[in-house]
Structures are given as structure tokens and as C-alpha cells.
């Protein structure tokens, strides 16, 4: 079987060294095994995605000396997401949710609500008549999303497992995340649904990604079982940390690869530094 990996950034900002590490891991894993490396642009968030960031992603990866066998865009696969949603709706596994973020936050801050930010299932308890009335409001411009009925879904699938290169066999517990959102009015598919369908459609055999998505894999395994999709092997890796010990992130102002390039740094040397860091298994920001 041909090994296929992918790097799937969102074009909502410039890439930083943490992205470089993940891309290099996925690229080198495939190339070392004579496999294919795919670049997938996760541009489904229309409100935040920018064309200039797509061009920046391509430029940054080429600067690092990476190449890929295919370039794809999530925005070209909207019909496939809708088909999957329709199939889950037909089986009674999704329900419309009309709660605002403020309402959910208020319910979770109530006494004895627990520490985990898990949706309390408010709209799951609506009667068919109540849900129909609220959907009328939606057609008049109201907001809504579609959530998976986790208890009903787990009753269909039964116990689930998946394999991780470091953790071994993982007993999936998607129920711990509650009735997660699979689509919103302004987003035809959530990350959970889109990434699961995309990996299957592209034949990805090995998913190489950060530890921050380890728990999300439980939900992806559930969707694979419900939709009859193959389960890839997973390789979750530690996130790159800055000198302060905190993870690098766009929102915290991590230095971008573009800024490094503009300072005249050599992308191939930067990539070599990342590989040397990975060989030492210490994902800390290399000193300049």
C-alpha cells in the first residue's frame, strides 16, 4: 500500500515554525517510504480565509524546500459534505440547535454544570413541533447549527478504537465531547466532518498532526464508523514550544516564516534546523 500523508493548513494567517515542523514531519514520513505528500487548503471558513494567505502558504513551503503531489481545496468539496450531512440526518443522528454561544456559556457557568465546556443538549430535548417552529425562524434569518446526537450515534457504532504511533491502541471516547457541531449556517461543515471526509476521499493512510488534535480523533473515528470510511493510522506529535515554554500559535503572535524569509534567512537551513530538533525529540523553538 502506498503511504499517503497530508498537510492541511487554514489560510487565515501566515505559517510559523510550528506549522513548518508539522509539514516537515508529514512530508518526510511519506518521502522516506516512497509515498505521496498532499497539500490541502482548509478554506471552508469563508469569513476568515484569505486568497493572499493561500499564496503565502505555498511560498512558505517552497521556501522550506518541500514539494507535494497534489494541491486541493476544501471549498471544492462542499457537495460531499452536504451528502454526508443528509445521510446522517436521514438516520436521525443529527438535530438542529438554535442556542447562541452566549446561551451555552450561561448554561455551562451555572452551579454544578461541571468544568468541561460540553454542550448540555438543550435543543436535543425539543419536541418535533418545537424544532419545526424554530426552523421557521431560521428560514426568516435566524441562526442555527447541526449537532450529532452522540448517544444515538454511539448506540449505532458500539465501542471504537484507533491506532496512534506513540499511544498505541486508543479506546475512543467521543461521548466525552458531547453533541459536537457538524455544520453551521455560515459553515457547511465543521472541522470534524470536513477533515474526516477529506482524508478518506484522498486515501490518506497516515495522519501526522499535533497533540492538540488527539482528543478530536475520537470524534473522527465515530464519523468514520457511521459513514463507512476507512480509518488511517495516526501520528500525533508534540507541539513546538517557544522560549517561554508556551505553544507557538498565530493568535499569540508567533513569528511567521514570511518574517524569517524577509530577514534573509535561508529556508533550507531553517528546515534543516527543524529536522535536527526533531531528531533530538525536543520540539522547542530553535535559537536563531
Where does each model-flagged region fall?
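Active-site cores that bind ATP or allylic diphosphates and position pyrophosphate for catalysis
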Residues: 103-248, 256-261
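Residues that form generic nucleotide/phosphate-binding pockets
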Residues: 60, 84, 107, 126, ...
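N-terminal Rossmann-like or analogous alpha/beta NTP/dinucleotide-binding catalytic cores
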Residues: 1-114, 211-212, 216-229, 280
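Polar, glycine-rich mid-to-C-terminal structural blocks
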Residues: 93, 145-147, 278
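Short alpha-helical "patches" and their helix-cap loops
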Residues: 38-45, 236-238, 285-288
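Non-catalytic terminal extensions that flank enzyme cores
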Residues: 1-14, 64, 133-139, 143, ...
